[in-house]
Amino acid sequence: PAMDINTTCTSFLSAVDIFSSLVDNGRYERVLILSGDTASAALNPRQPESYELFSDGAAACVLVHADKGENSAVLYGRQKTWSEGAHDTEIRGGCGLMTAFCMNEENREDYYFDMKGHRILKLCARKLPDFVDQCLEEAGMTREEIRLVVPHQASRALEMIMPRLGFAEGTYIDRVAQYGNLVSASVPFVLCKAIEEEKVKRGDMILLMGTAAGLTVNLLLMRY
C-alpha cells in the first residue's frame, strides 16, 4: 500500500513512529518513507521571516527489522499538539470554504504560508521543556545517555531553544544557516548528514525531535 502521513514538519517522525511498530510486529517486511516539500511554491515574498528561512528538499529511508545480533531499534515515540498554536503557522486558503477556485487578487495572501514566528517561539519555550522531561522519564533515559540530538531545523532560534531543553552546544546538530528549514525533509536530511560525517555510529542513542504546525511536537528515541 501507499499512503500520506501529514504532520507538516514532523511528518517523517510520525511515519517512522507508526511504521517501525508495524515492521516490528511483522505486518510489513520493508517500508520506504519519502519526505519532501517544495516550500518555495507557497511562500509570501512580503513576509521575510518565512521567505528567507524555508528551503525545498527531500529525503528517504527504508525501515526493516534489525538482523539477528543487531540492536538497532526505535525505542520510544511520542507526539502532542497544543491547539492554541493552530493559527501561528498556516495556509488559510486551499480547502474547505476557501478552495483554489476562490483565489483572487484581493485574497491571494490567504493562499500563501503565514507564520507568526515570535508567537511560535514563545509557545515552544513554554511547552517544550516539560514535554522533553516527561518523554525522557517515560523512556527511562537520561540526557547523558544520548549521543546526539537531531532536531528539526525550524529556525535560527534553535541555538536559544536547545539549551532550555538541557542540550548544550555540541550535543545537537544545527544546520539552519546552511540549509534553512526543509520542512518534513529537515530531520532525515540532517540525520543523513550526521551519519555521513560519522558523528554517530552503530549502537549510539539518538534523539530525533521537532515542532510542526498545530503546534505539534514529536519526539523519537532510537538506537542507530
Predicted regions and their residues:
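Claisen-condensing/thiolase-fold acyl-transfer catalytic domains that form or cleave C-C bonds
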Residues: 5-27, 125, 129, 136, ...
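Short, well-ordered, mixed-charge alpha-helical segments that flank or form enzyme active sites
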Residues: 11-14, 39-43, 83-86
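Acidic-glycine-rich active-site phosphate/pyrophosphate-binding loop
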Residues: 32-39, 100-106, 157-169
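Condensing-enzyme catalytic core mediating Claisen C-C bond formation in acyl metabolism
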Residues: 47-122, 126, 130, 211, ...
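Short beta-strand segments
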Residues: 6, 31-37, 63, 208-211
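Flexible, glycine-rich active-site loops centered on histidine and acidic residues
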Residues: 20, 24-58
